[in-house]
Regions:
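Non-heme Fe(II)-dependent double-stranded beta-helix
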Residues: 1-22, 27-142
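Double-stranded beta-helix
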Residues: 145-153, 158-164
Length: 164
């Protein structure tokens, strides 16, 4: 995993790390804390006031009656202008354009709120082939010579077992 700061970000080094090395990069301090605080407040508001919308791949949490400790907030574009600001950051756009091509699009934009004690999600990969265990469902010749998907995670809180 390669780490960058906003000032040290290099799109070519990032692409190399994503495609040929670990597949993961971290960009530290990419956003200002006021924007993160605003986004967190909106996510928490909707998580507290909307009907429960669970995440996928959470059979264990459901079986243990802990499903209420995790919630998905969908359609962030419609929840506040701050979410458009965050996702349209130059670093994200330069990286996604180079990795996926200039006509890439956002297939989903949501927040996953995990409260302390949450089990999180079962291991999976997202679209286009989430079930990495059933190779017979893959098209012939599937390989990683080009990217089909990329995910950006914007943490609104510090990740830890205690925080969820």
């Amino acid at each position: 995993m390669q780490k960058f700061s906003r000032d040290s970000f290099n799109v070519n080094e990032a692409i190399n790390e994503l495609m040929y090395e670990s597949g993961v990069i971290v960009i530290e301090n990419a956003y200002n804390l006021n924007d993160i605080k605003e986004a967190r407040e909106i996510v928490n508001h909707f998580a507290d006031t909307e009907e429960q919308k669970e995440t996928h791949f959470n059979a264990e949490a459901e079986a243990l009656k802990q499903i209420k400790l995790q919630q998905r907030i969908w359609n962030l574009f419609g929840k506040g202008d701050i979410f458009s600001k965050l996702i349209s950051d130059d670093i994200i756009f330069s990286l996604m354009s180079k990795l996926l091509g200039s006509e890439f699009f956002c297939g989903s934009y949501c927040a996953s709120r995990l409260l302390p004690g949450s089990l999180g999600q079962e291991l999976h990969i997202d679209y286009p082939y989430w079930d990495f265990y059933n190779s017979e469902t893959f098209p012939m010749g599937l390989n990683s010579s080009f990217a089909q998907n990329c995910q950006a995670t914007i943490p609104l809180d510090i990740f830890s077992e205690v925080s969820g």
